[in-house]
């Protein structure tokens, strides 16, 4: 019998029943909730008179709508200026109180972005199935977990039954070998991958990231890569368990203790793909060939190395792709063959569930230390992914480095990743962003988003336009 992939092992462990239509009922170990996709689910439970199936499998925190300025975070929820945002955060509080769900409320130091606090608290563990009403739940796959986003109706289903009806996916292996050049990061790996296979390349697959480069990454770097598996079209991204995984989880609040820990570790060490496991598709990347990446268009696949130029649609033979390029360049206000380094920035955003962990902030601070944000940049902001990340950064003095350079130092939340809170782009403004999506209007109506790593965003803030961070730090 052929060996199993990591995805196959986790699927088999959690499959409760197989249905006549080919779908399966799988058990869910961890459910994470936030204020945007949960209200209708809770209301559905009330109307049906259903209790939660397993209360302690759920945790919650507000992140999408919370303001990130101190003025709106110092008081009660009444300090939230936007009435819709205030209502959503208040509703989450009330629902969690009513149903007994553990919530990291807005002014709890442990509050933060769902995909930051889950791993940070040890609520995400190897071997788990993890779901959340958010597409970037794939982040948690970095721990050898089977994690993906779900819709609001599925949120209700998980709350009521602790199970989910879903289809088994095919297996893809993305193998990255070699040593990353200095200044090239996990964000650059995943952007280069998306540039290679496109935003539909992973459709129908669970992607396992492997190879010497992936093994050399920190857990933060692995989370960045798994976070953007969805931008490559895959619902699931994952990395096999190793000693880094186990060391990261050890001692965290929700992690097993004592003899339970020993038993868990013994099980976790088997959460790797077997040597003879079959993958339906294999994609290979060489780390040495990857350069700092910058998106120039309105899809994550519209990406180039920083030393390249914006493509010319006239060289595209596919009429559909050509039209897409023309539209993207028009929206972004760019011309064919513009050097990437000629793109000037209005704003810089360092944050989001992709790049707001302590490692990300350290990388950005290293670049801006002793430098100043360019006078042409209207706003540069750093938004830590959680209150604990913020506190750690302040212990290390990173906040002072950013503030002295001219950055705004904010409270944790999703912030400018998406236009659902006060942090937004104005129409026509270009932003170097460490987030994960650059669709039209993603950061504000008419806003122009360029996805980059934290180090590249920091370098762009100082220069006022895109530069190769490797040259700046040489």
Swiss-Prot record:
GO terms for molecular function: 3-isopropylmalate dehydratase activity; 4 iron, 4 sulfur cluster binding; metal ion binding. Keywords: 4Fe-4S, Amino-acid biosynthesis, Branched-chain amino acid biosynthesis, Iron, Iron-sulfur, Leucine biosynthesis, Lyase, Metal-binding. Its cofactor is [4Fe-4S] cluster. Binds 1 [4Fe-4S] cluster per subunit. The keyword Protein transport does not apply. One of its GO terms (biological process) is L-leucine biosynthetic process. CDD domains: IPMI. Pfam families: Aconitase. Its EC number is 4.2.1.33. Pathway: Amino-acid biosynthesis; L-leucine biosynthesis; L-leucine from 3-methyl-2-oxobutanoate: step 2/4. Transmembrane segments: none annotated. The keyword Transmembrane does not apply. [4Fe-4S] cluster binds at residues 353, 414, 417. It catalyses: (2R,3S)-3-isopropylmalate = (2S)-2-isopropylmalate. Catalyzes the isomerization between 2-isopropylmalate and 3-isopropylmalate, via the formation of 2-isopropylmaleate. Heterodimer of LeuC and LeuD. Belongs to the aconitase/IPM isomerase family. LeuC type 1 subfamily. This is 3-isopropylmalate dehydratase large subunit.
């Amino acid at each position: 019998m052929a060996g199993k992939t990591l995805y196959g092992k986790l699927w088999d462990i959690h499959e409760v029943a197989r249905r006549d239509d080919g779908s399966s009922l799988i058990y869910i170990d961890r459910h994470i909730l936030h204020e945007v996709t949960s209200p209708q689910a809770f209301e559905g439970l009330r109307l049906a008179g259903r209790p939660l199936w397993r209360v302690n499998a759920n945790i919650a925190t507000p992140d999408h709508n919370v303001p990130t300025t101190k003025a709106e975070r110092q008081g009660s929820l009444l300090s939230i200026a936007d009435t819709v945002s205030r209502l959503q955060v208040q509703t989450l509080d009330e629902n969690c109180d009513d149903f007994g769900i553990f919530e990291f409320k807005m002014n709890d130091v442990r509050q933060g972005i769902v995909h930051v606090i889950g791993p940070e608290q040890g609520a995400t563990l190897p071997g788990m199935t993890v779901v959340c009403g958010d597409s970037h739940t794939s982040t948690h796959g970095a721990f050898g977990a089977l994690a993906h986003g779900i819709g609001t109706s599925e949120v209700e289903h998980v709350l009521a039954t602790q199970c989910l009806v879903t289809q088994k996916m095919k297996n893809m292996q993305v193998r990255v070998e070699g040593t990353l050049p200095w200044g090239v990061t996990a964000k650059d790996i995943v952007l280069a991958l998306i540039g290679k296979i496109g935003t539909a390349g992973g459709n129908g697959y669970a992607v396992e990231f492997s190879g010497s480069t992936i093994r050399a990454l920190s857990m933060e770097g692995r989370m960045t890569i798994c976070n953007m598996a969805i931008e490559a079209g895959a619902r699931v991204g994952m990395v096999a368990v190793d000693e880094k995984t186990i060391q990261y989880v050890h001692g965290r609040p929700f992690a097993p203790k004592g003899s339970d820990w020993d038993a868990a570790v013994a099980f976790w060490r088997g959460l790797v793909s077997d040597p003879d496991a079959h993958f339906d598709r294999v994609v290979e990347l060489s780390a040495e060939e990857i350069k700092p990446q910058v998106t120039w268009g309105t899809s994550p696949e519209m990406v180039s190395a920083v030393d390249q130029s914006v493509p010319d649609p006239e060289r595209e033979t596919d009429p559909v792709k050509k039209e897409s390029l023309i539209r993207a360049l028009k929206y972004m206000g760019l011309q064919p063959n513009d050097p990437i380094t000629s793109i000037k920035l209005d704003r810089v955003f360092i944050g989001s569930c992709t790049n707001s962990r302590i490692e990300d902030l350290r990388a950005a601070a290293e670049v801006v230390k002793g430098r100043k944000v360019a006078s042409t940049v209207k706003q540069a902001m750093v938004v830590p992914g959680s209150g604990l990340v913020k506190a750690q950064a302040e212990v290390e003095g990173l906040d002072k480095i950013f503030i002295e350079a001219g950055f705004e130092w904010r409270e944790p939340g999703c912030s400018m990743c998406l236009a659902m809170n006060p942090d937004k782009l104005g129409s026509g403004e270009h932003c170097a962003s460490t987030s994960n999506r650059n669709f039209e209007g993603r950061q504000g109506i008419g806003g122009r988003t360029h996805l980059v790593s934290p180090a590249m965003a920091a370098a762009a803030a100082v220069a006022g336009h895109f530069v190769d961070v490797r040259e700046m730090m040489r």
